[in-house]
């Protein structure tokens, strides 16, 4: 991991904490846990154009773990999206462009409105399925064309994994083998009420493998190089994927 990556990840952590501190509320845990993952995604992996945030064939990023929003807003700002420092520091304020629960295109770069635990999982599956469907329409004219090649990424947390709505969406993605769909899981083993083991005992690696997912687990969620390798391997798998951090 080179020095510039380390500095960028640390700056992202500090900025997301500043946003939370100014608001007087927010979830710093996931912002610390997933800073390197968020940075790696934007700096090394994503096909996006900050100056044209609605470019149709862009990769999608869905925040099912909506409490990651301070980190995401900080990343949009650092990546050059049309979001200024003043708007960042208005996080969670009435009529601000940086609401606590992400809202579609507010600010630019937010691909879906999310908030309810597990709700973003179905949105992500829908985005990936829509890509397949639109390509099928194009291929009626020329079967060799594969014009839409975007990948949908979805950040999830323990609460998303315990949601009934997400269970149906995950199952559907596996049965339909929806590729170009990658879930990035902050597996910190904690809930708002205490340790995850008090309420949730499932072996998620085996469970998702049985659903037909490609599954990977990284012990070091701060290593940008290893994170990038894991994401690229998931993209090559030709399956829906889950990466645990």
Predicted regions and their residues:
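Glycine-rich ThDP/TPP pyrophosphate-binding loop and its adjacent helix/strand module
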Residues: 50, 106-245
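Thiamine diphosphate
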Residues: 1-153
């Amino acid at each position: 991991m080179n020095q510039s990556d380390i500095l960028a990840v640390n700056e992202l952590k500090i900025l997301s904490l500043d946003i939370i501190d100014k608001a007087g509320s927010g979830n710093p845990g996931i912002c610390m846990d997933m800073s390197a993952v968020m940075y790696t995604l934007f700096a090394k992996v994503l096909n996006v154009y900050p100056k044209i945030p609605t470019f149709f064939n862009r990769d999608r990023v869905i925040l099912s773990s909506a409490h990651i929003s301070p980190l995401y807003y900080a990343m949009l700002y650092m990546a050059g999206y049309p979001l200024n420092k003043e708007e960042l520091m208005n996080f969670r304020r009435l009529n601000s462009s940086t609401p606590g629960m992400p809202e579609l295109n507010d600010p630019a770069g937010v691909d879906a409105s999310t908030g309810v635990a597990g709700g973003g999982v179905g949105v992500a599956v829908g985005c990936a399925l829509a890509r397949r469907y639109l390509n099928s329409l194009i291929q009626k004219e020329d079967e060799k064309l594969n014009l839409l090649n975007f990948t949908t990424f979805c950040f999830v947390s323990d609460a998303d994994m315990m949601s009934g709505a997400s269970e149906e969406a995950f199952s559907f993605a596996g049965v339909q083998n929806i590729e170009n769909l990658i879930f990035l899981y902050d597996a910190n083993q904690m809930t708002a009420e205490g340790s995850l083991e008090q309420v949730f005992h499932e072996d998620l690696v085996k469970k998702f493998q049985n659903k037909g997912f490609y599954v990977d687990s990284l012990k070091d969620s701060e290593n940008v190089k290893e994170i990038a390798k894991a994401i690229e391997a998931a993209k090559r798998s030709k399956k829906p994927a889950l990466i645990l951090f």
